[in-house]
Swiss-Prot record:
Protein's gene: leuA
Places the protein is found: Cytoplasm
Stored HAMAP family: LeuA_type1
Required cofactor names: Mn(2+)
Protein name: 2-isopropylmalate synthase
Residues annotated to bind Mn(2+): D17, H208, H210, N244
Protein's UniProt keywords contain Protease: no
Keywords attached to this entry: Amino-acid biosynthesis, Branched-chain amino acid biosynthesis, Cytoplasm, Leucine biosynthesis, Manganese, Metal-binding, Transferase
Organism: Prochlorococcus marinus (strain MIT 9303)
Catalytic activity entry: 3-methyl-2-oxobutanoate + acetyl-CoA + H2O = (2S)-2-isopropylmalate + CoA + H(+)
Length: 540
């Protein structure tokens, strides 16, 4: 049987696999903010990126290893294909972390071998121990993944896994790369590996799931029963295509149904010991931070973290909840940190009070960013009576989003009405501080603003998404705007919040433009879509 740490290990890949969501690219400061919050959440492993993909990814992994990795903190992990160049870059990036891991992988399904790698089973079986051993020579902790394991021949899979463990892999990860399996099939796959790999007792069995059929978390729960003990998830379930297994759903399923799952860990069913090390009260905070920084809006009916997750519309349900919340709620909202805090801050409040609350919300701002956030807070306090945590999060996320901005919005002014043609005037500042003004007309005020900004920026793009939602309730609520731009097949998102949605739209568009300028031309390398280096030879 596979190694059993006695509980479930949570491997968070929000910063690697989650960032592969279209338009969800993060800059270094954003990745660092999320990594710091993941550490507060209590995940066991943070997969911080794919160091070989670009200098930006390498720097982000290295910075997270320096500032988030610690003797008592999470393991900092980097992803690497089964090639020496990838593995060496990964080792260098995670080197500053006291607890570090290299996660290397190669595909094992026949469809991947034939059409992507163009390699035989024998060649893959030779590559695996060589590359795992090389990784093991650089770090003490190596994880090996069989990409597309769910569609691989089980007998070949057993051979590959046995070779990887013999070469030094301490964790074996089984990905359902395309979200193909059903829970019973996935459970049987994990049980088969646990039973038929002779040296499986020397490694922890891990799983990685995609949600193409909406079964990722269900598959994981079945894998728990079959011996898997590490689970690779993302916050809010973000990821390419239909996303990944949602961390918050898995953790809370194990929390709420602990009596059911305890026996699979050799415990009494009524054992109160948690099955994960996750601090559940940090879940909502983490979800909102990731949503704010990626621009990926959480659907209202999303389990655990959706805005409707604890809402009751039916009169019968409302009556039951008022009498006893357990009639229609299986989770106390406070367990996941969901509160409707209204902070007692106003025009006379000081910077220290605002800074303290922001730190509680997971934001560690520089002095300059705090100054800007505090100025925006004071401005909002003049226009809005009650300031909530959601308001603060909306205010400060822009400071984290844009540490270096080529364009800065100085002014936006619009005129529109039932008998007027929508017209916008904008002033945009360049990096050198030079200000330029442009005016444009459009089908509406937002269209006019975007046309004027494009005229000044001179950066070709296509606006493919514009959405606005209320941050909080009330007529004075801030409106949060998300904009996505496309250029050369790449998506760039920006968001902003303001009590004036036109101003929010203008700033969101500028934020997206800044991401576009920073992101275009950056090396793009998708670890799950790119084969092992074509010219790679054994030993090179």
């Amino acid at each position: 049987m596979a190694k059993d740490p006695g509980r479930v290990l949570i491997f968070d890949t929000t910063l690697r696999d989650g960032e592969q969501s279209p338009g969800a690219s993060l800059n270094l400061e954003e990745k660092l903010a999320i990594a710091q919050q993941l550490a507060r959440l209590g995940v066991d492993v943070i997969e911080a990126g794919f160091p070989f993909a670009s200098q930006g990814d390498f720097s982000a992994v290295q910075r997270i290893a320096q500032q988030v990795g610690g003797d008592e903190g999470p393991i900092i992990c980097g992803l690497a294909r089964a090639s020496r160049a990838d593995i060496k870059a990964c080792a260098d990036a995670v080197a500053p972390a006291p607890r570090r891991r290299i996660h290397t992988f190669i595909a094992t399904s026949d469809i991947h071998l034939e059409h992507k790698l163009r390699k035989s089973r024998a060649e893959v079986l030779a590559i695996v121990p060589e590359m795992v051993a090389y990784a093991r020579s650089l770090v003490d902790d190596v994880e090996f993944s069989c990409e597309d394991a769910a569609r691989s021949d089980p007998e070949f899979l057993y051979e590959v896994i046995e070779a990887a463990i013999a070469a030094g892999a301490g964790t074996i990860n089984i990905p359902d790369t395309v979200g193909f399996t059903t829970p019973s099939e996935f459970g049987a796959l994990i049980a088969g590996i646990d039973c038929h790999v002779p040296n499986m007792n020397e490694a922890i069995l891990s799983v990685h799931g995609h949600n193409d059929l909406g079964l990722a978390v269900a598959n994981f729960l079945e894998a728990v029963k079959s011996g898997a003990r590490q689970f690779e998830c993302t916050i809010n379930g973000i990821g390419e295509r239909a996303g990944n297994a949602a961390l918050e759903e898995l953790v809370m399923a194990l929390y709420v149904r602990r009596r059911y799952f305890n026996p699979f860990f050799g415990r009494e069913s009524d054992s109160p010991t948690p099955l994960t090390a996750v601090r559940t009260e940090e879940i909502t905070k983490t979800s909102r931070l990731v949503s704010n920084l990626t621009g990926m809006v959480v659907q209202p009916n999303k389990a655990i973290v959706g805005s409707n997750a604890f809402a009751h519309e039916s009169g019968i349900h409302q009556d039951g909840v008022l009498k006893n919340r357990l009639t229609y709620e299986i989770v106390d909202a406070r367990t996941v940190g969901l509160t409707d805090n209204r902070i007692s801050l106003g025009k006379l409040s000081g910077r220290s009070a605002v800074r303290a609350r922001l730190e509680e919300l997971g934001y560690d701002l520089t002095r300059e960013d705090l100054d800007e956030a505090f100025a925006r807070f004071k401005d909002l306090a003049d226009r809005k009576r009650d300031i909530t945590d959601r308001d603060l999060e909306a205010i400060v996320s822009e400071q984290v989003q844009q540490p270096e901005a080529r364009f800065q919005l100085r002014l936006v002014q619009v005129s529109c009405g039932s008998s007027l043609r929508p017209t916008a005037t904008v002033i945009l500042a360049q990096e050198d501080g030079q200000e330029q003004t442009a005016a444009a007309v459009g089908t509406g005020p937002v269209d006019a603003v975007c046309r004027a900004l494009n005229a000044l920026a001179g950066e070709p793009n296509e606006l493919i998404e514009f959405s606005v939602k209320s941050v909080t309730e009330g007529i004075d609520a801030m409106g949060e705007v998300t904009i996505r731009l496309r250029r050369d097949g790449q998506l760039f998102s920006g968001h902003s919040a303001d009590t004036d949605v036109v101003v929010a739209a203008a700033q969101a568009f500028v934020n997206a433009l800044n991401r576009l300028v920073a992101g275009c031309g950056r090396q793009s390398l998708h670890p799950q879509h790119d084969a092992v280096l074509a010219d790679r030879r054994p030993g090179i």
